[in-house]
Amino acid sequence: ASWQDGIKEYRTKKGLKHVYDEYVNVGVFYVSDDFIKTSGSATGHMKLLKSIKSDGSVKEGETISVTYSCNYIPKKDNIYQTSNITPMIRQNECYLLVYDKIVNSDISEKFETHGAKLPINYSTGNSASWDISPLRLSDSQTLKIIEKGKVYTIEELSDYDLFTCGTGILQEWYRTKDAILRYYVGDNYAELAANWKRKERTGNE
């Protein structure tokens, strides 16, 4: 059996719908500014757009200073050992994140997550539609857009995804990301991100 089969078996035994279920806090965050990458971490600001599960430590609409552990590998359970995808945090993008209880202190907040980018578009319009369409998926180096209708291999897609990981983990992530977002956010998760981006641009509710 593959390690993917092992994950599914573990989820079934534990009654887990998704890897996020053991966390207290789950939310959709909007990235307010560019994150500054340092060795093993990145710092910046995020606004909580939608609270999905929460202990109340961060309120919807609140912007917090964040230190993101870029090399973080969750330790809570074996299931998390295969979920070490690391998002490259980018300004004006939205992410589904799980995080530990926020403690009031002078240091930035720590997020425990492998993350799921919100949303992902494999078929996009031309550059003129970037400002009104959901957040685009593009090559992290050249910002070249994925071509509509073209079939890509996992290796080719990894060049266009803003994540770093092995292709096996990437393949598993592609299979589960939509289910995760729909489970916690709803079927309109892509619309949610597009509307939020429009509000930030125009200042209108």
Locations of regions flagged by a protein language model:
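Short structured motifs
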Residues: T12-G15, V31, S83
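Beta-strand/loop nucleic-acid-binding surfaces
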Residues: K59-T86
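Solvent-exposed loop/turn segments at secondary-structure junctions
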Residues: D34-K37, S51-S54, C70-P74, I102-S105
